[in-house]
Design a protein with these regions (language model features):
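A detector for small-residue-rich transmembrane helices and their helix-helix packing motifs
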Residues: 2-271
Length: 271
């Protein structure tokens, strides 16, 4: 027996975005859209000698523990590093404000991104460059943005299929043919896998403006944010098809990136 099509029409989906945007408290707009970028500009304006000693992460001095957190809010180059990070942060934040309706999830992800991700990315940076047998310095908001980017992409996919979520676990709810049903499941799997692919791509080490991007910090922020979203989803409703595919994609992404790092370490140490 065919059930009703659980999907909402496009106008209703757009209406949800408008409702989400209107629901944010003015303080949310003030803190995340104004205060956070302002903080980055204020830190940039500090004397460079002060930043180098107290804020910038230096793998030669891992005991400067404050740099594990503060380096993520530090920039020494106005353009393109600072401006690029602020612009990308605002774009990603706009996606989050448009697609998020769960304030508790937002608070948890924001807290994780702003406080835990900088420490995690610094630890990964120190460990990797120790494996290289070399030293480096690190700074910038990119790891935090990576976590927010994973969050935004997750929300977009969730917004796209949330009204059909039960269908993925119960074929009897789907009004179409079995072929259409399995095609829909495959498309969801591809969408979730592409999120992780984006994380792996962001984790590659590339030259940007005369400096090498800190790929492991980007990947650490991205994949940890995605893993936290998975854990929150599991705690709320247990395993589903959506969570199974997301969890599998995260695991494959971590293994894929670990192999990339293994090859990279061998190359650097032999150079």
């Amino acid at each position: 027996m065919e059930g009703p099509d659980p999907a909402r029409d496009p106008a209703e989906k757009i209406g949800q975005v408008r409702s989400n945007l209107r629901a944010w408290h003015p303080l949310d707009w003030l803190v995340f859209w104004i205060a956070v970028p302002a903080l980055l500009f204020v830190v940039y304006a500090l004397p460079q000698a002060f930043k180098d000693r107290y804020l910038v992460l230096d793998t030669q001095f891992p005991w400067r523990l404050q740099t594990w957190l503060l380096s993520s809010y530090t920039h020494s180059q106005f353009y393109p590093h600072l401006i690029g990070n602020v612009a990308f942060y605002l774009v990603v934040l706009g996606m989050i404000f448009a697609f998020e309706h769960d304030r508790r999830r937002f608070r948890v992800l924001a807290g994780w991104s702003f406080l835990a991700v900088p420490v995690l990315s610094s630890g990964l940076t120190i460990a990797l460059w120790g494996a290289f047998g070399r030293n480096t310095t690190g700074q910038g908001f990119s790891a935090v943005i990576g976590a927010f980017l994973a969050y935004a992409m997750f929300l977009f996919v969730l917004w796209s299929v949330e009204d059909r979520m039960a269908v993925f676990d119960d074929p009897s709810l789907f009004p179409g043919s079995p072929a259409r049903y399995h095609t829909l499941r495959i498309l969801l799997g591809i969408a979730l896998a592409l999120i992780v692919v984006m994380g792996v791509i962001s984790g590659t080490f590339t030259e940007e403006g005369g400096a090498v991007s800190n790929g492991i910090a980007h990947f650490g922020g991205f994949i940890s944010g995605l893993a936290l979203l998975l854990l929150m989803s599991l705690k709320k409703k247990g395993w589903s098809y959506f969570d199974t595919i997301l969890g599998t994609s995260i695991l494959v992404g971590i293994l894929w990136y670990a192999y990339y790092l293994f090859i990279l370490v061998r190359f650097v140490r032999s150079a």
